Structures are given as C-alpha cells and as structure tokens.
Amino acid sequence: MVRAAVAGIAGRMGSRIAQLIRETDGIELAGGFEHSGHQAVNREISEIIGGSPTGLKVTSHIAQVLDTVDVVLDFTLAAASLEHLRQASARGKAMVIGSTGFAREQLEEAEKLAGRVPCVISPNMSMGVNVLFKVVGDVARLLGESFDVEIIEAHHRLKKDAPSGTALKLAQVAAGALGRNLEEVGVYARRGLIGERTGNEIGIQTIRGGDIVGEHTVMFAGSGERIEIVHRAQSRDNFARGAIRAALWVVRQPPGLYGMDHVLGMK
C-alpha cells in the first residue's frame, strides 16, 4: 500500500486529489498540509475534504508528514513545490508535482534534486493532454514550415500564472519539432501596429474568466486551410486521477526526473 500526503490539501486540486486517493485501491491518504496560518491547519482532514473521519489533522509543514509517507503530491505554487522537493529529497521521499510557473533555474534545481529521489513533474497530468502533446509534435513535423502555429489557452479567473504550463509545453513541443527555440520565437501578446507575422513565430494567447477548468487550442494555419486541435477539460478529476496514477508509478522508479509521458508509457 502506497502512503501519500497531499500539499495544499485545502485547495481546489489538493482537496480533490485527497478525495480520490480515498477511493483508489493501492494508495491511502496518510497526511495533508497547508501553509502556516491557513485556517485549515489543525482541523480533521475530513472536515476539509468531506467523507468519513481520517484520524489525521492538517499540518502546517511538509516535515510533519514526511516520516509517515512514501510520496507527496503537490499542486501548489512553483516556489513552494521546489521547497517541498528540497525537503522530500533530503528524506528520500518521492514526489509528484503538478504546479506550474517554474522559472528555468527552478527547473534546473528540481532536476538536480531528483538525482536523489524519483520525481514526476508535469504541467498537466490528464491522459488526453499528454496525448495532445504527442499529436502536436507529430503534426508540426508533418506540416513543417508552411503552416503558422498559434496556441490559445483559457482558464478560470483565479488562475495566477499565464500562460498556462500546458500552453508553454505545447509551444515547446511544436518549437522542438520545427527546430526552433521557443525563447526566440515565442510571441505572448500582440497589440498596435506590429507589422506582418514572421514565419518562425509561435503565438501563445491567454484567456481568463469564470470557472473554465482548462481549454487549449493549437492552430496550424496554412494557405487556404487550417487544422485546429482542441482539448477541453470538463472536470479536475482528469488531473487528479493522473496525479494518483503518477504517484503509484513513481514510488517504483529509481531516482530521476520524469514526466507524464514516462508514466503513461509514451517514452
């Protein structure tokens, strides 16, 4: 039985992951924590996520749960997730991280820390989106330079980072397939008299509003035709179930940094 703790257990993703862990065979909820001062701290976990009593209280620090768990699932913020990985790696505990907004230097540190423990980091853990990553790469390679690539993403009004980690990954996949460097060709906003679109641009545009769970459209626009590939998430359960699948997988792996393509056997 895999024993799991959930970071940010009172949040939208954290609470749903915790709920689904309790419904999934082979894994049990063994802890949950929030940042110091959060109103959920010291409350029974079931008061936060619902269901029958767990016998566990929400703690205020990852260190308070590490001794009793095998893996930590973390959908918080990039800086918090990196600090949690520092502590988990020092104690030999696996991690699954779905936080987005990592800077390059943060990802570089995460890769070094993953030399001590197995860790899955992915901006999106749904099966559909990970298939989308592969499809976009394949389509970009097939169409080549004659089609322009544009990515549009939409999320709920409370999402803090933009563009989404998924949109950035889609852009990176397309850029890689076309032999481009996203840092050089990515365009994140257009306004005013900007002139003609350059041939190498990859556009990434952001929408925020309402309670949109997540929507990503990748457009390949050519002369006289275009292809649009769309993924719409209708529930956070897709992400939560993917994270649990990753947790069950990662505890059996050697130290290293993995993605959902590894978990799903796509790489």
Curated annotation (Swiss-Prot):
Keyword Oxidoreductase: yes
CDD domains per the UniProt record, alphabetical: DHDPR_N
InterPro entries registered for this protein in UniProt: DapB_C, DapB_N, DapB_N_CS, DHDPR_bac, NAD(P)-bd_dom_sf
Coiled-coil ranges (or none): none
Catalytic activity: (S)-2,3,4,5-tetrahydrodipicolinate + NAD(+) + H2O = (2S,4S)-4-hydroxy-2,3,4,5-tetrahydrodipicolinate + NADH + H(+); (S)-2,3,4,5-tetrahydrodipicolinate + NADP(+) + H2O = (2S,4S)-4-hydroxy-2,3,4,5-tetrahydrodipicolinate + NADPH + H(+)
Cellular component GO terms held in the UniProt record: cytosol
UniProt-listed Enzyme Commission number(s): 1.17.1.8
Position of the signal peptide: none
Amino acids binding NAD(+): G8, I9, A10, G11, R12, M13, E34, G98, S99, T100, S122, P123, N124, M125
Alphabetical list of SUPFAM superfamilies matching this protein: Glyceraldehyde-3-phosphate dehydrogenase-like, C-terminal domain, NAD(P)-binding Rossmann-fold domains
Pathway of action: Amino-acid biosynthesis; L-lysine biosynthesis via DAP pathway; (S)-tetrahydrodipicolinate from L-aspartate: step 4/4
Record keywords, A-Z: Amino-acid biosynthesis, Cytoplasm, Diaminopimelate biosynthesis, Lysine biosynthesis, NAD, NADP, Oxidoreductase
PROSITE patterns: DAPB (PS01298)
Subcellular location: Cytoplasm
Active site: H155 (proton donor/acceptor), K159 (proton donor)
GO molecular function, one term: oxidoreductase activity, acting on CH or CH2 groups, NAD or NADP as acceptor
GO biological process, one term: diaminopimelate biosynthetic process
Entry binding sites for (S)-2,3,4,5-tetrahydrodipicolinate: H156, G165, T166
Record family assignment: Belongs to the DapB family.
Role according to the record: Catalyzes the conversion of 4-hydroxy-tetrahydrodipicolinate (HTPA) to tetrahydrodipicolinate.
Official protein name in the record: 4-hydroxy-tetrahydrodipicolinate reductase
Protein species of origin: Syntrophobacter fumaroxidans (strain DSM 10017 / MPOB)
